[in-house]
């Protein structure tokens, strides 16, 4: 079939398998052209491995450190008549390229929050890898079925203690509009912490540790975004911020747990990028469009692969890691450069419907958004007939 982008709200409902493969290849080429990661990991588990930062971690490990990788994700395969999810195609492409390079690459499709998927992962590590020396936690999910209670909990993006009104960008209609968010209830805050906080990360490490599949010296990191003053009311000081603070709490006990075997645990803070998750946050498209323009002007613009490869090379496995006073690894320091932030803040209130394309890089934002789904990739013929039914050999699919 010939596949064209069809966007509804903040989701593109079509995906392009050849475009997704080309996107993965671009990221692999970036890593291989920038050289190996000294003293990097060799056997890596990535939880949330199919898109965005998790995919970039899998690529950085496999192609920057010659690591064998096991990826966990929740995606949908395509059929002859309907495209699958971008994450499915990304993972198929990653496995193809990693296998060609002689690296082990296997994937588990299912609910990473569940006890069952944790057990399947442990069994697969025991059978195929023995032990892992790095666990990357990169889940972005709107809801979670708690494995102990069976209750399905949802996360909420809301301020705490006050109503907040801010500028938003309607990306469909390409108009600016004010968005008002009512304060979260305590139940909504608790739900957001349960979905996006550190409990599941802790459960994963506990399960892996008890099963004896963590190597001596094993490291773990969970990816997060903190943002700057302009987003704080709905982010750091809101319901999602409470989940981020929970990560900061949980990492302390995980760090103690791994330190007993010479290992370490860190929260890694990454910059704002276009993802399916960030495009759903009302103020992020405008913020990202302004940020992209400013960072491209200063020559510091980065996407997922540049961020994660740099995090691995400089901080996770580097001699002089970028660490903040909370003990987090920081890869977002170029975004938080005071001059960059000052320019974003200065332009924030001056953007109008008429000058949107002049004051911001909304064009770049839209391109990055479509690239998530395999569109707008250089060298891909989007008029060609493609087969949306792409197999992942050896996948362990717990959803069927």
Curated annotation (Swiss-Prot):
The record's catalysed reaction(s) read: a 2,3-saturated acyl-[ACP] + NAD(+) = a (2E)-enoyl-[ACP] + NADH + H(+)
Quick one: which residues bind substrate? 225
Q: Name one GO biological process term.
A: fatty acid biosynthetic process
Metabolic or biological pathway = Lipid metabolism; fatty acid biosynthesis
Entry annotation: catalytic residues: 235 (proton donor)
Q: Which InterPro entries match?
A: Eno_Rdtase_FAD-bd_dom, Enoyl-CoA_Rdtase_cat_dom, FabV-like_NADH_b, Trans-2-enoyl-CoA_reductase
* Pfam families assigned to the protein according to its UniProt record, in alphabetical order: Eno-Rase_FAD_bd, Eno-Rase_NADH_b, Enoyl_reductase
Q: Which Gene3D superfamilies match?
A: NAD(P)-binding Rossmann-like Domain
Q: Might you give the EC number(s) for this enzyme?
A: 1.3.1.9
Q: Which GO terms describe its molecular function?
A: enoyl-[acyl-carrier-protein] reductase (NADH) activity; NAD binding; trans-2-enoyl-CoA reductase (NADH) activity
Q: Look up keyword Oxidoreductase and say if it applies.
A: yes
Residues the entry annotates as binding NAD(+): 48-53, 74-75, 111-112, 139-140, 244, 273-275
Protein's UniProt keywords contain Oxidoreductase:
yes
Q: Where is this site: Plays an important role in discriminating NADH against NADPH?
A: 75
Tell me the superkingdom of the source.
Bacteria
Enumerate the UniProt keywords alphabetically. Fatty acid biosynthesis, Fatty acid metabolism, Lipid biosynthesis, Lipid metabolism, NAD, Oxidoreductase
Give the family this protein belongs to, as stated in its UniProt record: Belongs to the TER reductase family.
What job does this protein perform? Answer: Involved in the final reduction of the elongation cycle of fatty acid synthesis (FAS II). Catalyzes the reduction of a carbon-carbon double bond in an enoyl moiety that is covalently linked to an acyl carrier protein (ACP).
Entry-linked PANTHER family: ENOYL-[ACYL-CARRIER-PROTEIN] REDUCTASE [NADH]
Q: How does it assemble?
A: Monomer.
Q: Under what name is this protein listed?
A: Enoyl-[acyl-carrier-protein] reductase [NADH]
Query: What is the species listed in this Swiss-Prot or TrEMBL entry?
Result: Burkholderia lata (strain ATCC 17760 / DSM 23089 / LMG 22485 / NCIMB 9086 / R18194 / 383)
Q: Which gene encodes it?
A: fabV
């Amino acid at each position: 079939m010939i596949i064209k982008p069809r966007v509804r709200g903040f989701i593109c409902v079509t995906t392009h398998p050849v475009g997704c493969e080309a996107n993965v290849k671009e990221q692999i080429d970036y890593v291989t052209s920038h050289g190996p990661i000294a003293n990097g990991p060799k056997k890596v588990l990535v939880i949330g491995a199919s898109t965005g930062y998790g995919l970039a971690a899998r690529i950085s490990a496999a192609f920057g450190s010659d690591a064998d990788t096991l990826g966990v994700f929740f995606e949908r395969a395509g059929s002859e008549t309907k495209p699958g999810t971008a994450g499915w195609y990304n993972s198929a492409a990653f496995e193809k390229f990693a296998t060609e390079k002689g690296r082990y690459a296997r994937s588990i499709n299912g609910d990473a929050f569940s006890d069952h998927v944790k057990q399947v992962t442990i069994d697969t590590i025991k059978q195929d890898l023995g032990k892992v020396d790095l666990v990357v936690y990169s889940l972005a999910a709107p809801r979670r079925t708690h494995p102990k209670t069976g209750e399905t909990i949802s996360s909420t993006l809301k301020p705490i203690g006050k109503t907040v009104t801010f500028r938003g960008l309607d990306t469909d209609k390409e108009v600016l509009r004010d968005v008002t968010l009512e304060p979260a209830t305590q139940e909504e805050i608790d739900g957001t912490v349960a979905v996006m906080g550190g409990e599941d990360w802790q459960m994963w490490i506990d399960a892996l540790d008890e099963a004896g599949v963590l190597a001596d010296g094993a490291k773990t990191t969970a990816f997060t975004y903190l943002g700057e003053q302009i987003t704080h009311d709905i982010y750091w000081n809101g319901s999602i911020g409470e989940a981020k603070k929970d990560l900061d709490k949980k990492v302390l006990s995980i760090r103690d747990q791994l330190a007993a075997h010479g290992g370490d645990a860190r929260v890694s803070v990454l910059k704002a990028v276009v993802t399916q998750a960030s495009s759903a946050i009302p103020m992020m498209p405008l913020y990202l469009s302004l940020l992209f323009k400013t960072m491209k002007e200063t020559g510091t613009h980065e996407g997922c692969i540049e961020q994660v490869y740099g995090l691995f090379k400089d901080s996770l496995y580097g001699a002089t890691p970028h660490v903040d006073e909370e003990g987090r690894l920081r890869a977002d320091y170029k975004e938080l450069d005071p001059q960059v932030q000052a320019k974003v803040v200065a332009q924030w209130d001056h953007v109008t419907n008429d000058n949107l394309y002049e004051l911001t890089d909304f064009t770049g934002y839209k391109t990055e958004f479509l690239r998530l789904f395999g569109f707008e990739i250089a060298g891909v013929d989007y008029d060609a007939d493609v087969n949306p039914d792409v197999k992942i050999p050896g996948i362990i699919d717990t959803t069927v």
